[in-house]
A protein has these predicted regions:
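Catalytic cores and adjacent flexible loops of soluble metabolic enzymes
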Residues: 1-183
Length: 183
């Protein structure tokens, strides 16, 4: 109920983003949504659960827009196949390392996979989608950045005590300011 948006909500978010010079994007989970929401988006996001969704990959690829693809639980050959079906220039695709545990323990973040992705996909942008609970030093994010993650995705909340499945492991304003100063 609290995390479902309708078209009018996306339109409102898109307008707010444009007004504030923020690039608007969202994850889409079916081909119909690509048709409906593409006019609002300059970037597509493909969730880890859709890395093998060939119709969705092809549909998004035909839009010729920048695309971010999460790779949680994926093998290298699955990532290669996803890129083949997207059929986009490498610089238009960011491959995001992530772990599908919510929250992820710092020791389970497998940050070495950022280097593996950089080695196997040298022409793509490599990023990191983080699901760890922010610690005082934001060490996981700092290491990911130092390893070369060009895009860092972190859930954000204005109140970590809100109900829902993301708020407690999300970044808040203080975490964001601290991370900005770290890098």
């Amino acid at each position: 109920k609290y995390d479902k948006f309708e078209y009018k909500d996306y339109k409102k978010l898109n307008n707010y983003s444009k007004k504030n010079k923020i690039q608007f994007m969202t994850s889409l989970f079916d081909t119909n949504s690509v048709e409906i929401y593409s006019p609002l988006l300059s970037v597509f996001k493909i969730s880890s659960s859709d890395i093998n969704n060939i119709p969705l990959l092809r549909k998004i690829g035909k839009e010729k827009k920048h695309t971010i693809i999460s790779t949680g639980a994926s093998k290298l050959n699955e990532i290669k196949n996803a890129l083949k079906y997207l059929n986009l220039p490498p610089k238009k695709v960011c491959i995001m390392h992530c772990v599908l545990n919510y929250p992820t323990k710092e020791e389970d973040a497998e940050l070495n996979k950022i280097s593996i992705l950089k080695k196997n996909f040298p022409n793509n942008i490599i990023g990191y989608s983080d699901h760890t609970v922010p610690d005082e030093n934001l060490i996981t994010l700092k290491i990911a950045f130092d390893l070369g993650a060009k895009i860092i995705e972190k859930h954000f909340t204005h109140n970590k005590k809100l109900s829902g499945n993301d708020h407690y492991h999300s970044m808040d304003t203080q975490n964001l300011l601290k991370f900005n100063n770290l890098i």
